[in-house]
């Protein structure tokens, strides 16, 4: 376990939420390769995606790194007609995080957050710790409670995926 804490870790510490911290070489940018580097099931390592709805509201979705976000399912979960990925250049000003280091924990503003229901198949899942090269492992229930997330079916092999 690493001693160099990110803001996301400090926030969990403040709420006494149990997690483990892991590092990997920051030049590894592919989520499936990150899972392999950690020696973990790629279905248990989640990426954080930020979208905007047709109503102009932002929503956050956490899905396995080996899966794609089904935009229709995401819109349904968010109660919107449609959702679209934000532009990469909008990510840091909006969330405080850069691409590859976006955590669902500790964004500049609290956005509605949804976690793919498959997370409930694991006692613990991995999410970004808020810095490229850092991951943290925690209970999906603890993550959902902390960020106010709802579990929903968010992935499929549909054509409209990201």
Language-model regions, residue ranges each:
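Extended, low-hydrophobicity, polar/charged segments
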Residues: 1-162
């Amino acid at each position: 376990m690493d001693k160099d804490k990110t803001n996301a870790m400090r926030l969990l510490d403040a709420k006494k939420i149990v997690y483990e911290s892991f590092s990997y070489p920051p030049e590894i940018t592919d989520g499936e390769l990150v899972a392999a580097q950690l020696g973990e099931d790629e279905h248990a390592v989640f990426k954080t995606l930020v979208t905007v709805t047709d109503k102009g509201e932002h929503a956050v979705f956490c899905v396995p790194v080996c899966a794609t976000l089904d935009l229709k399912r995401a819109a349904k979960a968010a109660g919107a007609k449609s959702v679209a990925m934000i532009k990469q250049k909008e990510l840091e000003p909006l969330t405080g995080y850069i691409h590859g280091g976006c955590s669902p924990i500790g964004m500049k503003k609290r956005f509605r957050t949804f976690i793919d229901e498959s997370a409930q198949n694991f006692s613990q899942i991995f999410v970004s710790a808020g810095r490229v090269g850092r991951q943290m492992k925690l209970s999906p229930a603890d993550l959902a409670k902390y960020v106010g997330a709802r579990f929903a079916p968010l992935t499929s092999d549909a054509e409209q995926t990201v």
